[in-house]
Amino acid sequence: MIYLGADHAGFKYKEKIKEFLTASDLKFEDLGNLQLDPQDDFPVFAFRVAERVAKDLAEGDQSARGILICTNGLGMSIAANKIKGIRAVLITSKKTAQQSREHLDSNILCLGANTISFSLAKKIIRTWLSTDFLPKERYIRRLKEITDKENAGDSNN
């Protein structure tokens, strides 16, 4: 399942992404905002999407993904990464989309509605969704280091 979320700045982009995913026969769920609200706050939607992705992953659905959109993708990525098990990435090119999946097993894609064209966004989404994690020893080791720190409970150690 692909979970979508956007604040007011990413709302129109999200609606276009829904059309793109539908045309691509990809299953998704829109977690909001469901209507344009100029007063909404991005963390609400970042947490909502990240919590659903994390829950699905914890229940064994390794295909769970999220796509978050705000003005520049920065706030969404910071907020989503506060949820245990989430590896949210801000992507601006097909190459980094590919590497974020191959090297980092990223599970949430963050996009900036005001920083990349929709044409590029579609290419990024297509690349990100179609790229698998490469289980090379060094990538596994690095992800384990991140997960160990995340599970330690004390970010100052």
Positions of the model-derived regions?
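Short, conserved beta-strand edge motifs with alternating hydrophobic and charged residues
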Residues: 5, 29-32, 66-70
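A short, Lys/Arg-enriched amphipathic alpha-helix followed by its capping loop at the start of a domain
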Residues: 16-26
